[in-house]
Amino acid sequence: MLNKKKDFDEIYSDLMQRADGQCYSAYIGEDYLPHINMGQYRERSASVPKRLMYFLTLLIESLKNDINFPRFLMIDTPNKEGIDKDNLIKNIALLTEADKHNYENKCPFQIILTTGIDTYSEDYKKFVFFKLEGEKYLLQENILEEKC
């Protein structure tokens, strides 16, 4: 168990330092919650990489080891927390790290991300499945005709 925690801490710390230029320390505590910079207070936008990299690390661990975590991530509008566009794009680009840990594509996994238009790198445009623009809404009103 200690080896898995150590492995998690190494991956999480690496991802956090790459996601947030002000991060110098990242690990999970005995309570399994993420701790950044020895608990030093950070602005609200720092919670985006903290959570995103935490869940990405769990996904990576599930690809490497048999742990109780689905090989599936759904991330809904991480930009709501006030992170600036450039840092959001940098954080989203780190999602490709899952591929690097999925040796020989042995484990299928999926990441679904909903975010603002063009808040991802050019490399990710090929992965965009659906865009809501203009008057296009995900949910549509269904008008039924009355039959007499």
Task: Annotate the PLM regions.
Residues 1-33, 61-70:
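Extended, charged coiled-coil "arm/hinge" scaffolds of SMC/Rad50-like chromosome-maintenance ATPases
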Residues 76-78:
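Walker B catalytic acidic pair
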Residues 46-72:
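GG-anchored amphipathic helix commonly corresponding to the ABC/SMC/Rad50 NBD signature/C-loop
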Residues 91-148:
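C-terminal lobe/lid and adjacent interdomain/linker elements of RecA-like ASCE P-loop ATPase modules
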Residues 42, 64-67, 100-106:
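Conserved catalytic network of the ASCE P-loop NTPase/AAA+ motor domain
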Residues 33-55, 81-87:
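Conserved ABC ATPase signature
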Residues 68-69, 73, 85-86, 101, ...:
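Domain-scale terminal segments
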